[in-house]
């Protein structure tokens, strides 16, 4: 019995193994078939039914294992006896439709799979189920997307077809309308052949009348504005009215410039340099001259006010024909030679300059490009403003020419001598007297704006004997004239002379003495004197060869400078007694000397034509006042005085250069004694004479004079 039961169990186990292998193979095949069938269709196949049966069997086996663990059966026999009773119930409850109780009993009785194998098998089955679910969902989504895409494509195709149909319908309608219009036009032409020509002629006549009225009104306004401008200019010249500089002088400038940008206006202003005057006639438009229709400003104003409003008709294609008809109907026919806007084959319209081969082409260009519109009217306004500005400029230039002619034909006036000449006056007093008496005096405030007046007449071009003493008086240095120490002049203006390129108002002898006196031991070598000159005055930092020669000449000429030999070499010192002695010997303005100056032989040769003109035109008596001389005139006068130093040294004793650019000297309060001139000398009045003491020896006084600057600055 035991052997038979063993053989049965072995056979059952082998059968079970074969059954499981067949089941597993069926499962694999089913899974493959399921995947392939899922690709083809979504319907439930037999393989899927096998899968469901296998799942139900596994669930039943799991429940049996749990029951065995909980019940804890003692003998396998009892378990074998109880299994046939329990399995059919559970299997019948779980899958009563698929697996029969006999099949479940066979599967459970064989006991081939262990619990671990059953769990692994369950996990594999679950993973397979998840994959199948994901694949099914993915397939469903793809089918939905494909369905949506198909629907969208169908809708787009339908819309395109509808649009094409609509376009075709519209084209057909347009073609039908064009055909109908052509048929109507043909019928009208057949019925009324002359009606269109009459309508065109009427439109042309209306447009011609409107254009003529516009041109007439514009010309009336222009003539009225020109008359108002001339009236204002005449009143302004007479001094009855004054126009502020910030206010527009002409009412035309306030007109709006419609149709032009600021860039175009600037271009028009640049291209009007060759504009002719418009005083003889107004603007000619289309060959119709309307300037003779107005006789006065009152009639023009009344006609312009009484003119009715004009309706502007649209000019489409008959513009050139209208203007040509108007030109033919006018009494005056223009030619290429007489037209102002045409010359040398070029259109002279401002800003145009189009090339036209003949006059007919020019007329076509004029009618097409420069028709009566906003742009052309704005260009006319700009041209009116240009003409008015040029007229104002012409009037100013004419007044300037008249003043120049008046000045050239006027007899030159001579400077009047002062009523009571003084022997000693200061430079400030001299300036005031000359400003009050001399007609060559300059205005006090030349920078203030004034009305245009006739220029002041200039002085004589020939030096008179009465003006020669003034030259000598001007050349005298104020520091030497009043015996003011040089240190008091240089100290306040030290920085000025050090930085400004201005000639100091002192003689070389005075400067050399000052350099020596400022040294610690009152003696300097020649190189130290040169260093003091360049260190103290910016003027001596150039032209070293000329002024150094003058310094050496003055050192050897004047007796007050003593050369001393010592261990270091030769040094120069100052003999104060000799210096003060020579300083006190000054010329006092001898009448005999003054009378002999015009008759001297060397005087005429020393003054050339340029020197005479410079002395006459630059008003030499004003040189003592630095505020009345500009930089250019001061440089010229300085050169003039440098030329005068060599020939007029006998007039005075000290000084050689114009103090025009030097700062105001610090003049101390000095008691000046006034003495009338001797009666026998009244025939030669003198505005300035210097110092009280008179020295009959001219050569002794010339010893202290410096080297002439005409030789220094060559």
Swiss-Prot record:
Pfam families xrefs: Forkhead (PF00250), FOXP-CC (PF16159)
Biased composition (Acidic residues): 698-714
Skewed-composition ranges (Polar residues): 1-28, 314-323
Main location: nucleus
Key word Lipid biosynthesis present: no
Ranges of biased composition (kind: Low complexity): 291-304, 437-458
Segments for region (Leucine-zipper): 387-408
A single GO cellular-component term on record: nucleus
Sections of the chain in a coiled coil: none
One MF term in the entry's GO annotations: identical protein binding
Positions of the DNA-binding region: 503-593
Region (Disordered): 1-45, 280-338, 437-464, 648-667, 677-714
Compartmental location: Nucleus
Annotated keywords: DNA-binding, Metal-binding, Nucleus, Repressor, Transcription, Transcription regulation, Zinc, Zinc-finger
Annotated function: Transcriptional repressor that may play a role in the specification and differentiation of lung epithelium. May also play a role in developing neural, gastrointestinal and cardiovascular tissues. Can act with CTBP1 to synergistically repress transcription but CTPBP1 is not essential. Plays a role in synapse formation by regulating SRPX2 levels.
Quaternary structure, from the entry: Forms homodimers and heterodimers with FOXP1 and FOXP4. Dimerization is required for DNA-binding. Interacts with CTBP1. Interacts with FOXP1. Interacts with TBR1. Interacts with ZMYM2.
Full protein name: Forkhead box protein P2
Organism listed in the record: Mus musculus
